[in-house]
Amino acid sequence: MYSAIRSSLPLDGSLGDYSDGTNLPIDACLVLTTDPKPRLRWTSELHERFVDAVTQLGGPDKATPKTIMRTMGVKGLTLYHLKSHLQKFRLGRQSCKESIDNSKDVSCVAESQDTGSSSTSSLRLAAQEQNESYQVTEALRAQMEVQRRLHEQLEVQRRLQLRIEAQGKYLQSILEKACKAIEEQAVAFAGLEAAREELSELAIKASITNGCQGTTSTFDTTKMMIPSLSELAVAIEHKNNCSAESSLTSSTVGSPVSAALMKKRQRGVFGNGDSVVVGHDAGWVMPSSSIG
């Protein structure tokens, strides 16, 4: 359908006297249709040269069809072709720019939403961390309270143990003192029994001794009366008088005066009226009432 009309291009790229684009030799990159009114087909190569020219001129807003045609230097390219293509290029760039702006707006909105969601999530995380820290603080406080109560209970148990030990020591000392007192009482009782037995033996020996001397055979040790010092003094004096009288009697035997004197002296010397038997060989004198 399409046919390419090719012609040679000058090496310097000059356009000669055909600056308006008419009656120009056709460039090799131009492709025209075979219609009665041929139309230009913008190939990729031609479009690239157009874009390069527009870029060199400062963009689609500053470039004009004439400046673009001069910059491109393509023979056979008219102002009509460049004007329509430049208009389409501007519209395409504008739509691309709008689409880019829209995409930027969308991305900004998305970023703002992401920022909002991230801030919300950060607030949630902060609240969760604060709640967890509060729970940890409460748990630590409860643990410290339990430890304090346990320490108090241990202190009470320690004091109670000390009191129990002190009371046990006190009771042990009282028990030792009681055992010691009982032992002392037992020793004293044994000594008392020994003394009692010794006294009984001495009394029996004394009664046997008196029986051998002829005083009496029925001598009661329980009724034995030991004379006092005054009675012993009177008995000794009476003994002396008796010895004196015996000497007088031996010198005046058969005298009635001596007989009366002997009768007169045979009277009691103790306060109770008992007579005293005085022997020459006796060591001490007993009352007559104590002799059975």
Swiss-Prot record:
InterPro entries: Homeodomain-like_sf, Myb_CC_LHEQLE, Myb_dom, Myb_dom_plants, PHR1-like, SANT/Myb. It holds the Pfam family Myb_CC_LHEQLE. The keyword Lipoprotein does not apply. Keywords: Coiled coil, DNA-binding, Nucleus, Transcription, Transcription regulation. One of its GO terms (biological process) is double fertilization forming a zygote and endosperm. A motif (LHEQLE) lies at residues 150-155. Residues 65-90 bind DNA. It comes from the Eukaryota. It is found in: Nucleus. Its main location: nucleus. Induction: Up-regulated in roots by low Pi. Disruption phenotype: Embryo lethal. Signal peptide: none annotated. SUPFAM superfamilies: Homeodomain-like (SSF46689). GO terms for cellular component: nucleus. Belongs to the MYB-CC family. PANTHER family: MYB FAMILY TRANSCRIPTION FACTOR PHL11, PROTEIN PHR1-LIKE 3. Homo- and heterodimers. Interacts with PHL2, but not with PHR1. Transcriptional activator. Probable component of the central regulatory system controlling transcriptional responses to Pi starvation. Binds in a sequence-specific manner to phosphate starvation-regulated promoters. Required for female gametophyte development and function. This is Protein PHR1-LIKE 3. It comes from Arabidopsis thaliana (Mouse-ear cress).
